[in-house]
Amino acid sequence: MKRATRATACVLMLAVLAVGAAGQTEERTVEDRLVTLAQQLRMGMTLATVAAYSPTLDDLRLHAQQLVNLLEGSNGKHFVRPAPPADDVPGLLVEMAWLGTRFDAALPDPESRARVGNAARNVRTFLTFALEAALTALDERRIDRASTDMLRTYAFLLAAYERPCDISYVPALWTLLRAFGVTEQLGADTPEGG
């Protein structure tokens, strides 16, 4: 079981690297970077799920650290080089901050800028909460508590991804994707209200 978990981790991180390497260059458009961010965020949700259901605390910590690396990037305070991705990556929080500086120029309409600004703040907040929960999981000594922290991490990542539920709607990443017309590139249906 332990070998299968580690093999899964390697496959997941190769996918993260492939998505991340798809464009670290400055010349990529806001739309392209949003699509990459969404793909990496989905990978983060997968890592959080794998961590939450890991059979051992060591396995959970491995996946939690991979997620911390994905969130913070290689220049992050909690980045650990031995845990994939080993290459330099900007991190979801850094990428979201960069994108936030480009939205006003990309959207001429004041109403769209306000909506996108709110969504961008929500995404950054949810990603920050996810990072805090993953770091808490790394410090836990009991697997049941660490698993709960990783489920909380998953919930924050899911909120950042913005798949609305029947009860409430909080604008986040899907609002950004709709604003830039790139939801089709993800091969997914647009959530209700989009």
Question: Which role does the model predict for each range below?
Answer:
Residues 1-10:
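Bacterial N-terminal signal peptides that target proteins for export
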Residues 25-194:
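Mature extracytoplasmic or organellar-lumen-exposed domains after removal of signal/transit peptides
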Residues 19-23:
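Sec/Tat signal peptide C-region and signal peptidase I cleavage site
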Residues 9-18:
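Bacterial N-terminal signal peptides
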